[in-house]
Structure formats: structure tokens, C-alpha cells
Amino acid sequence: MTVKILVSGAGVAGTALVNFLCRSKHEYDITVVERAPALRAAGSQLDLKSFGAPLMRKLGLIEKVREKSIHETAFTFVDSKGREWARFPVNEAGKGYEGITSEFEIMRADLVAVLYEASKEVSANPFMKGPQKLRYVFGKHGVHFTQGNSKVNVVFSDGSSDDYDLVVGADGQYSMTRRLLWEPEKGSGDTTLKYTGVTAGFFQMPKSEDEADSTLFKNCLQAGPRGLCLRCAHKDFTQAMLGIPTTDEHKQVFKKPLEQQKQMWEESVGSFKWQGQRVLAELRKSDDFYMTPVAQVKVDRWSKGRVVLVGDAGYCPSVMTGRGTTVSLVGAYVLAGELAKHGDNIDAALESYEKVLRPFITTAQEIPSMGMGMFQSKFGVGVFYVLLAIISKLKIDRLLQALMKEEKETWELPEYPELEFEA
């Protein structure tokens, strides 16, 4: 029996899922629809932590990721005068406590491109157990779902419709799939989004002369709390990241034009003595600025009938955990593995997907307690910097790595012999 699958979203989770599905001994007819007219070129820097690198290695893609990786060497804290107070070196992926920056740092667009091209290659490989039928359709998305006993009828944005055995929502934190099926009632708002109290902004700007050879991720905190980060390791540009407390206005940000969104940041950015005026000037000129209230996605169950969520659409851990990419890869792997394991029994596969993955997601969504209240005042920020300096100088962060290693490995990545990977 050929299982007909619709995947909504051609981001990290969607393209990763297709790669894993194409290694199944079962036959799939897969359609991936993406709202954008092409693969999205925008996006910030991502990293592979814990199980992320091993999963890319299973797919035979780790060297391609390495080729595209950004050589970031350390995460530093600087004060308003640019003086460095603490430095934490890169963490080797999958080993010990997960640091802020890791061995595999890659731009989102590059990672998606690697997964996208690989999925097309493996789906057409006659030596795999498939081959699987695969097509990508851009500029299209689902707008209505009707569930039957074992099928889902999907009406698309272009007016067409079709039936599928399984629909996968891999369409990100603001998933249309989730909003259509998981909101308790129309007009109630997306109750599955749990805001963290921080709003983040991102954009790229030209490198300054002193950043030409820099491989550092620089971070400056000030009272408010407010944060300004510059990631300097990319050879072509510097990535600016901003963080401020969330307001109700931020939650309606998508209804505002880009220029109004940027104006919301001008006061906060301009208040930074370190790099503030430079970043403000570049912000005003930028055409790739993106802002979002930092939120997690939490739902009681990731599937409804024959519709299932994967990646940020179902369990976004937020940028504050630093594990979003890895969570998407793990979720895609487990979903594909359970589908392969249970064959035609899709309902059993979805039940097992929930049971196997839930403990990992619960841990992955834990946000470290930073005592945000201490950052409200200059004194509190100063105390935090002193603590960071002590931790960095005495290399206590390495001690934390050793002590927390066992805790990080309590959940084990399952093996699925039903998925065929190259030796």
C-alpha cells in the first residue's frame, strides 16, 4: 500500500522529515507545499546540538553541513565600553553540557538547502528501499481540513483540493495547520503560544573593519533588561540580534509594516553605548529585519486524527533554549521512524510518536532560570557580569559540562532498523 502524505512547510522540519521518510521500506507518495514562492532565503544562524549532529551524520550530510558551517569560536560578554568580561569557547556537538555556541553553526537557508537537495536525490535513488514519489510545490498552502475515517481532505490556497492518508504540519512556530485545528474556537487567539516575556529582533549588516577576521559571538546586556548581540564569524556580514521585554504591541507585530516594526526598536537600540548608534543606522537601512515575541509552542497532543505536527509547529522550544534546530531534527526522525515501524497502521504510529518523543520535548523546552529580575537595574547587570567573569576565569563552565553530562543523556535516541541509512 502506498501511503499518501502531505507535508506543509519546506523548512528544517519539513525537509528533514522527507529525508527520513525516503529511507523507509514502505512506499510513500509525498507532496510538500510551501507558502513562500521558493525556499526562504532569510533566517538567522542555527546550530546543531546533542542529537543534531548524529542525525545529520545518519543522513550522510554532516560534511555538507561542515562545508557551510560558520567558524564561531567563542561567546563573549562585553560592557558598554566594549571591554570583554567573560569568554566561553565553542562546544563540540553532542558532547557534554551544551554551550551557547557549538561546533556546527550554519545559516538557516544553507541548512534547508542541504536538506532540500538531499531529499530530491535520495527519493530518486533506485538502490534505496523505495524509491519514493516526492514533489515540492511552492506558493501554495492548506486553508481547510476535513477529516474522514482514514483520510484528510485538504483545500488549498489556489482552490484545488485532494485527499491524503496523513497530513504533517511542519509550518513553523506560527503554523497555519495548528491554528486551523488546535484553536479551541475561532477568534480566541493562538492559545498554544506561551510567551517568554522577551521580544527578539534580527537583521544582517555590513562587517566593520575590526570584525573582518572576528570569529566571536559578542553579547552586551544593560538594565531594562535589554540585550544586543553581534555574531561576527560569517565572512560576508555581521548578524545583529536584539532583545527587549515583550509588550502587547509586540504580539500584534505581524499586522504592522516593516518600517513601523523597526521604529519600535529605535529607542532601545540607540540607548546602547556599545555599538548602539552603528546598529541603529544599519537597522534603518535594513530590508531583512525580522522581529518576533519569543514564545514556545505547547499542545497537549501533537496529532488530531490523521493530522500531526512536527518541529516548531508542534513543540517550538524558543530561541532561549538554543535547541530549536535539534528538536526539529529529532522530531522528524522519530515521526518517520514510527511510521516506518508501524507500516499501514498510521494511528498506532502517531500514538507511539507521542509516547517516544514527549519526554525529550519536555526536557528540551525547559528554559534555564536566569533570574531576569536582576537585569532590571545597572547594579544587577554589574553583579551578573562579575559572576560571569569568575565563571569564565575559573573555567567553572567546564565543570558544569562534566556535572550535567549525565543529565543531558537520560533520553536515548531510538534506533529504527526500518529506516535504511548508508554505512
Swiss-Prot record:
Its EC number is 1.14.13.-. GO terms for biological process: terpenoid biosynthetic process. Xenovulene A is a natural product exhibiting little structural resemblance with classical benzodiazepines yet is able to displace high-affinity ligand binding to the benzodiazepine site of the gamma-aminobutyrate A (GABAA) receptor and could be potentially used as an anti-depressant with reduced addictive properties. It is found in: Membrane. Binds 1 FAD per subunit. Its main location: membrane. Its cofactor is FAD. Pathway: Secondary metabolite biosynthesis; terpenoid biosynthesis. One of its GO terms (molecular function) is oxidoreductase activity. FAD binds at A10, G11, V12, A13, E34, R35, R108, Y290, D312. Disruption phenotype: Severely reduces, but does not abolish xenovulene A biosynthesis. It is an enzyme of class 1 (oxidoreductase). Induction: Expression is significantly up-regulated under xenovulene A producing condition. One of its GO terms (cellular component) is membrane. Keywords: FAD, Flavoprotein, Membrane, NADP, Nucleotide-binding, Oxidoreductase, Transmembrane, Transmembrane helix. Pfam families: FAD_binding_3. Coiled coil: none annotated. The chain crosses the membrane at residues 371-391. It is a single-pass membrane protein. FAD-dependent monooxygenase; part of the gene cluster that mediates the biosynthesis of xenovulene A, an unusual meroterpenoid that has potent inhibitory effects on the human gamma-aminobutyrate A (GABAA) benzodiazepine receptor. The first step of xenovulene A biosynthesis is the biosynthesis of 3-methylorcinaldehyde performed by the non-reducing polyketide synthase aspks1. The salicylate hydroxylase asL1 then catalyzes the oxidative dearomatization of 3-methylorcinaldehyde to yield a dearomatized hydroxycyclohexadione. Belongs to the aromatic-ring hydroxylase family. This is FAD-dependent monooxygenase asL6. It comes from Sarocladium schorii. The gene is asL6.
